[in-house]
């Protein structure tokens, strides 16, 4: 009975926990230091002690010895003492529950330099101490919202990745994140400049340490776009100013358009249009943009439309407000006093006469 129980426990452990394959050291100067995969995607980390060029990374997905899919990824160059990461996605439609194997091999022409296997189980629910509530990504970064299961605190490691094609162009690891009583949101901002209108993938790999060691990953594609926000609007009869804040790793190369309408309720009655170029802005940058009207506005109520226009001409953000200009009050001129019409400098003449009198009196006494 005891041997049967031990056998059952071993089988449960095999089904729940991924089995990490052994490194095959064919060329000790280049190794696959890490390999991860599930039924959707995976990643490979390669470290090298020598310079290599034009290598092929071959990745296979198999079940019970039957190869389901093969991916080939070019490695144009890897420098001595460096590491590269490659990401991949599977598009296997029909999948059965059970164990699968992902294998990665590096080839220089037909010569295999290194290989590694990774075994995982698909379709079998595993015990987990966390719940992923939401995952989002955009041109600024990636966010993940994580909740603990009641009464089951956990410590996790997060590895964020920014993927361009098969190339992992940015990665950031955050270790020992506690998940205990409340929902935890973790946000990572990209530290790379992105190309406008290009497709990227955001990946996060989560290592859960308890109650059972396991790894899960989430993938969120996005299209890189410019994004800025208009804040701190000031306006009066002479002009307007705003603060423009960058919220994307795609450089904002546009301008700000100030449009004044009068009367304010008629969108066809444009009074003034001023366009001011903006400096390049990325996430976290801000700049003050000012517009001065060619002539001060007359008394009245105006609508002010402020638009941040991107490099392609699309309006990215808009703010509307009202400018109220009151009639300028003319200060009345005070009436002149009779004494003010006296001969200019007459008070000075009196002072001069008094001074001369004092001098004459002193002269006579002497």
Feature roles, as predicted:
Residues 178-341:
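Membrane-proximal extracellular "stem/stalk" segments
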Residues 48-55, 149-156, 247-255, 299:
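A short beta-turn/strand-edge loop motif at beta-sheet boundaries
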Residues 55, 98-102, 156, 198-202, ...:
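Exposed beta-strand face motif in extracellular beta-rich ectodomains
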Residues 21-37, 119-137, 221-234:
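Short, compositionally biased P/S/T/A/G/V-rich stretches that sit at domain boundaries
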């Amino acid at each position: 009975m005891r041997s049967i129980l031990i056998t059952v426990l071993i089988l449960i452990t095999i089904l729940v926990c991924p089995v990490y394959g052994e490194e095959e050291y064919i060329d000790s100067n280049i190794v696959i230091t890490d390999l991860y995969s599930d039924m959707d995607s995976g990643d490979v980390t390669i470290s090298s002690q020598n310079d290599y060029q034009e290598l092929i990374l071959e990745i296979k997905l198999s079940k019970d010895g039957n190869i389901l899919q093969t991916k080939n990824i070019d490695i144009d160059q890897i420098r001595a003492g460096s590491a590269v990461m490659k990401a991949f996605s599977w598009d296997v439609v029909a999948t059965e529950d059970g164990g699968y194997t992902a294998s990665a091999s590096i080839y220089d022409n037909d010569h295999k330099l290194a290989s590694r296997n990774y075994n995982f189980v698909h379709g079998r629910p595993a015990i987990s101490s966390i719940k992923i509530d939401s995952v989002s990504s955009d041109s600024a970064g990636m966010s993940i919202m994580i909740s603990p299961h009641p009464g089951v605190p956990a410590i996790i490691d997060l590895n964020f990745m920014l993927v361009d094609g098969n190339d992992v162009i940015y990665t950031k690891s955050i270790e020992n994140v506690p998940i205990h009583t409340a929902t935890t949101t973790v946000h990572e901002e990209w530290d790379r400049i992105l190309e406008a209108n290009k497709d990227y993938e955001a990946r996060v790999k989560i290592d859960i340490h308890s109650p059972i060691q396991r790894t899960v990953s989430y993938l969120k594609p996005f299209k890189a776009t410019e994004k800025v926000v208009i804040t701190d609007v000031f306006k009066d009869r002479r002009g307007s100013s705003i603060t423009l804040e960058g919220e994307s790793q795609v450089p904002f190369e546009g301008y700000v358009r100030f449009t004044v309408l009068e009367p304010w309720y008629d969108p066809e009655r444009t009074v003034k249009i001023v366009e001011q170029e903006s400096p390049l802005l990325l996430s976290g940058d801000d700049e003050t943009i000012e517009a001065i009207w060619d002539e001060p506005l007359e008394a009245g109520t105006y609508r002010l439309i402020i638009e941040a226009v991107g490099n392609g001409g699309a309006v990215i953000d808009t703010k509307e407000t009202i400018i109220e200009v009151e009639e300028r009050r003319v200060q009345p001129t005070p009436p002149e006093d009779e004494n003010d019409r006296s001969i200019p400098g007459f008070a000075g003449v009196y002072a001069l006469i008094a001074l001369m009198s004092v001098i004459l009196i002193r002269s006579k006494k002497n």
